[in-house]
């Protein structure tokens, strides 16, 4: 290929920063929408900030800072949440001799899971590490098997928020504690380098 053709190919394949999503070619998540009938899921959340926006740049810098020097306690939190956010709640409940409502939680999550994936695929937000290099920002991602879907909203935080709501109905005295645990879950995903803070905020709104 001649030099002029190479240059032309680069120009032809140039993608606007704001058009970069998690998937190069957006796909629709296949879901039985009858399970969420009556809810206009497209109106649950606003669009995430554009990749070129000052807010996104600010969030990327925040994620970058948090991923540079993680403490052992932070690494442990990341590992626990990455495996199962409910472990945070199990320990809290065990110390107080309280039970986790497993059947109720999973029955509700079977519905919430549809929302989560439909929203993720609909917005197709790129993960922070996909956009950071375009702003000359370094994010040290701790790679696992739990961040291979679009970023917005955070599935882990949807999960932990549901747990907080479910447990608050049973044990209202500990409501603040339950939602604080969900905050820790969201922090863990930022510390891991796989989510924007606004991904977590969106999960709280959608749950």
Show the residue positions of the predicted features.
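Interfacial helix-loop-helix junctions of multi-pass membrane proteins
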Residues: 184-207
């Amino acid at each position: 290929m001649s030099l002029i053709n190479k240059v032309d190919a680069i120009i032809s394949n140039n993608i606007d920063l704001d058009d970069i999503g998690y998937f190069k070619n957006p796909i629709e998540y296949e879901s039985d929408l009858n399970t969420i009938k009556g809810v206009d899921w497209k109106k649950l959340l606003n669009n995430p900030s554009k990749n070129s926006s000052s807010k996104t740049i600010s969030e990327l810098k925040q994620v970058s800072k948090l991923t540079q020097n993680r403490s052992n306690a932070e690494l442990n939190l990341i590992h626990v949440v990455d495996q199962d956010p409910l472990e945070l709640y199990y320990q809290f409940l065990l110390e107080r001799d309280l039970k986790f409502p497993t059947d109720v939680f999973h029955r509700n999550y079977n519905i919430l899971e549809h929302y989560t994936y439909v929203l993720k695929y609909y917005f197709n937000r790129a993960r922070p590490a996909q956009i950071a290099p375009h702003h000359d920002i370094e994010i040290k991602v701790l790679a696992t098997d739990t961040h291979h879907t679009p970023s917005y909203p955070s599935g882990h935080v949807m999960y932990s928020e549901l747990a907080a709501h479910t447990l608050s109905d049973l044990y209202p005295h500990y409501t603040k504690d339950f939602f604080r645990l969900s905050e820790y879950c969201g922090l863990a995903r930022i510390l891991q380098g796989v989510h924007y803070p606004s991904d977590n905020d969106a999960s709280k709104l959608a749950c």
